[in-house]
Structures are given as C-alpha cells and as structure tokens.
Regions:
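Short hydrophobic alpha-helices and adjacent helix-cap/hinge residues
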Residues: 1-351
Length: 351
C-alpha cells in the first residue's frame, strides 16, 4: 500500500470516528487514534522498505567452461535491465565441469536454497534442473539448448516451468559438415568423440546418420566416459585412421577441448565444432550461434518472468544470429589454405 493510500484510509477513518462518537469520548480517545494512525503508517512503511530491499537469488547451473560466456552475456543484459548484483540480485554460480553426479547435486542444492530462478547453459543442465525443480514453483530459464525437444512439448509454449532459447545446434550439424567439405574436400573418415551416456547422445547420433552420408562421410563414434578419459582417448584419433574430427555440443567432450585441439594439430586433422568459443580456443571451424548473444536474449525472458510472466506461456526462442567462424592460426598449423570465397563469407576469424 502506498503512503498516499495509507493517509487516505487514516483520514477517512478519523472523519468517520468524529461523526459517530460522543464529544467526551472523542476527546479521551483522540490520543489513541493518533497513536493507532502512526502505528499503521510505520508498519506499512516498514513492509514497503522490506519489499524494496529484497534481493533476488538466481542460481546458474553450468556444465562446462565453454558454456560460461552465455551466463556472462546474461549478467550483462540483466544489469542493463536494472538488476544490480549485490543490490537487488545475487548470483549463485555452479559449474559441474562435465561431472553428472556433481551436476545433480548442485541442482538440488539450488532448489533446497529456494532460489528465485535457475539459469542453465546447456540441454544437459536444463534437463537436470527440470528434474530437480519438479513440484516446485522455481522457474528455469535455459540460455542455450541444442535439443529443446528433450525439454518441451512444442516451441509455442513450454507448458511447464521452463522457458528459454534454442541454440539450433542439432539443426546446424549438416551445415558444419558442408563447410568442412568445402575446406577439406578429401575428408571422408571423421572421428566424433561423444559421451554415450549423455542427454543428447541419441539425438546427436540420429542427426549425424541423417545428414552426413549424402556428403560422403563415414562418421565413427569415439566414446568418452569421463573427463579423465579424454587424455586417454584423444591419442587414438590419428591421421592413419581418420581424415577429420567433429566435436558435437557434448558437455563432457567439450570440457576436454585442449586435448582435442592438441591432437588435431599434431595429426594435421581439421577439427569442426558445434561451439563458437571452441574456434577461439583452437578448433578450425564452426557455424553456430553466439552464446554471449544467447545469454543476453535469455535475460529478457528472465526479466519477464521475474515481473510476473509464466514460463509455461512463453514461446521457445531461436537465435537472433548464426555465425561462420574460422581459426586461421589452426588452418596454417595443419597446412590448410582457406579459399578466398570462404573468407569473404566468414563472420569471425581468430588468429
């Protein structure tokens, strides 16, 4: 209740009191009325101040370092929208770094802490958050999901406590292989490191089987079961057995990016990736959404929800832009010359 409304109520009450009570009784009770009026105003003001000073807690559930820039974009846009860290919002940042057990524990901790919202940066993180928040009123906003079909019934409305942005990662798989063919036409045998227990595994394999045979590729799965596994598995990918490497948006595989890049350069194999940030870190190419931009896009959704919108009523959004990115230093290291016509189409280059 506003100060003006409180004042109006007290004034009307005092006027009504003067009309219906005897003069003698009024005189004796006037001090009591004044005290009561002041008490009402002070209590209301105290409640208003408490509400104004409430600090929202937003939990961030990340599954790999490579997805972290989505949350950085989110925080930056939230600041622009008026959410100042330490003043009216607090962020509880968690990163499982590819560990599924740790991820489940972190999600449950956020629920137990009764956070106001959980923000995720991958399909794996979102599925885990959805399971942890089942039966609660905690909204989950996913800043990037390569496979939203795992999360919602349709793109029009989620019908649940989930809302967010699709990275369109699966849909762009064929395009990445087409680019690899343009850059390295002789590539036929492709190694694909992947977690067979991952949330996206079946969808990734189905998309690969559908999109790559027509391009003349034979894609072989190289299974990775833990982060520690990466250093053991990566050396098995050699130029004797393969012509190139493709890294899907797999949280566990992505956490070992340095090993895959090191092996690709050592064996002079082109390495295509599903993540823009991985090109900056040494992969040769990608055609993908910008996770920082996705984070900013997701902040607008979060703002709507924090102001009263229901996640179930919000449509799943698509990326505002898709970028072609190349790492020219890596191209030189593996002895690959980038055709001029491809360079002219490139949105971002890293050296």
């Amino acid at each position: 209740m506003s100060y003006q409304a409180i004042y109006s109520v007290v004034t009307r009450f005092s006027l009504r009191w003067s009309q219906i009570t005897p003069r003698a009784f009024r005189a004796k009770s006037s001090k009591g009325i004044i005290f009561l009026s002041v008490a009402i105003i002070l209590l209301a003001c105290s409640a208003q101040d408490a509400e104004a000073q409430k600090i929202l807690t937003i939990g961030s559930l990340n599954t790999a370092n490579q997805f972290a820039n989505a949350f950085e974009g989110f925080k930056g846009r939230m600041l622009e929208l008026g959410y100042k860290e330490g003043q009216n919002v607090r962020y509880d940042y968690r990163n499982s770094k590819g560990n599924a057990d740790a991820l489940r524990s972190m999600a449950q901790q956020l629920v137990d802490d009764k956070v106001d919202m959980i923000v995720t940066t991958s399909t794996t993180g979102t599925v885990t958050a959805a399971n942890a928040t089942a039966g609660t009123r905690i909204p989950v906003v996913f800043l990037s999901a390569g496979n939203p079909q795992k999360l919602v019934k349709n793109y029009g409305t989620s019908g649940s406590n989930l809302a967010g942005i699709s990275s369109a990662s699966l849909e762009l798989t064929a395009k990445r292989f087409e680019l690899l063919k343009e850059l390295y036409p002789r590539a036929k045998r492709i190694a694909m490191p992947v977690d067979p227990k991952g949330v996206n595994y079946q969808s990734i394999v189905a998309e690969i089987q559908e999109s790559t045979p027509r391009l003349g590729y034979a894609v072989s799965e190289v299974h990775v079961l833990s982060v520690a596994d990466v250093a053991k598995v990566a050396p098995s990918i050699t130029s004797k057995n393969y012509d190139g490497i493709f890294m899907p948006a797999d949280s566990l595989v992505t956490e070992g990016i340095e090993e895959w890049v090191r092996q690709s350069i050592k064996e002079k194999l082109p390495l295509a990736t599903s993540l823009l940030v991985n090109v900056k870190r040494g992969c040769l190419l990608t055609y993908a959404s910008d996770y920082t931009a996705l984070g900013k896009q997701g902040a607008v959704l979060a703002d709507k929800i924090l102001k009263g919108a229901k996640p179930a009523d919000l449509p799943i959004e698509l990326p505002d832009k898709i970028l072609l990115a190349l790492n020219l230093k890596t191209a030189k290291a593996i002895g690959l010359k980038i055709p001029k016509e491809i360079l002219l189409r490139t949105d971002e280059t890293f050296e």
